[in-house]
A protein has these predicted regions:
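P-loop NTPase catalytic phosphate-binding loop
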Residues: 1-97
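Phosphate-binding and hydrolysis-coupling loops of NTP-dependent motor/remodeling domains
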Residues: 12, 41-42, 79-80, 87-150
Length: 150
């Protein structure tokens, strides 16, 4: 996991599925070290990417991982504000957007789908329960509910 600032995901530290946690001071070598075991089947989770920015030294390695995992079970999960996504035309977010796969939590309107080249109905944008999201894939979109650990 790449966590550039405090995150609720820190609770997962110590879980056997988490290979490690990297912060703002980490570099591409640190990430490569964590990925050396099973690259194609490892998911990199990047929380608050808008804090990390496109200029961080780890980003080329993260982009490389997105491309390496196209035909495997691994990948990259990037969490970022929807407003910030619109202005990122290069780097990790742009590469991830090309997959046309994503999850938009509490979408504000049909235009939010355009970030993934998806057309959403105009009815999207009303109040939704916490954890409600639109899952977008190359085959379309569907409403999903993100489960809450109790």
């Amino acid at each position: 996991m790449v966590l550039p600032r405090r995150s609720p995901l820190m609770e997962l530290v110590g879980n056997p599925s988490v290979l490690g946690v990297l912060g703002m001071d980490a570099g591409p070598g640190d990430l490569s070290e964590l990925l050396k075991e099973d690259v194609e089947n490892t998911v990199i989770v990047v929380d608050d990417f808008d804090t990390l920015t496109n200029d961080h030294s780890m980003n080329p390695r993260i982009e490389e991982h997105i491309k390496a995992c196209r035909d495997h079970h691994g990948g990259v999960l990037v969490a970022c504000g929807i407003d910030e996504v619109g202005g990122m035309y290069r780097g990790v977010v742009a590469t991830a957007r090309k997959t046309r796969t994503g999850l938009i939590l509490a979408p504000r309107g049909s235009d939010d789908g355009s970030h993934f080249s998806a057309r959403l109905p105009r009815s999207i944008g009303g109040p939704v329960p916490k954890g409600r999201a639109v899952q977008i894939s190359t085959t379309g979109w569907t409403w999903v509910q993100v489960p809450k650990d109790q």
